[in-house]
Amino acid sequence: MRNVYDIAYELANALKESNEFKRFKAAKEKIEKDEKLKQMVMDFKKKQLELEQKRLQGQEVTSSDVYSLQQLYQIISLNPDIEEYLSSEMMLAKILADISKIIAEAVDLKDEMFGLLESK
């Protein structure tokens, strides 16, 4: 039987070689080279995190909160470099979430890891 850590490293290497990761890495490098774009992305992510923390703490997330974040996204994503960064980041995050779900389901931990309750 193969060592699970060796397989994890193989998966990590496969991810690094994927088109999705390469796209994300290139977009990230562009953002990091431009201080103004970097600050815009950081401000957006900060507001996004604040909204998520509010939700996780059981505080009400108002439609105004959501609208404000959506408006900010629409404004900053007018910049093609930011739009590319955010969309490539979202695609990479989806792949990582899918991989986590596949692993959790394979070892029967889906409910524990994702908080899903099945009615039996």
Curated annotation (Swiss-Prot):
Family per record: Belongs to the UPF0342 family.
Protein name: UPF0342 protein Csac_0863
InterPro entries found in the cross-reference section: Com_YlbF, YheA/YmcA-like_dom_sf
Family annotation (Gene3D superfamilies): YheA/YmcA-like
HAMAP family: UPF0342 (MF_01526)
Organism: Caldicellulosiruptor saccharolyticus (strain ATCC 43494 / DSM 8903 / Tp8T 6331)
Pfam families (alphabetical): Com_YlbF
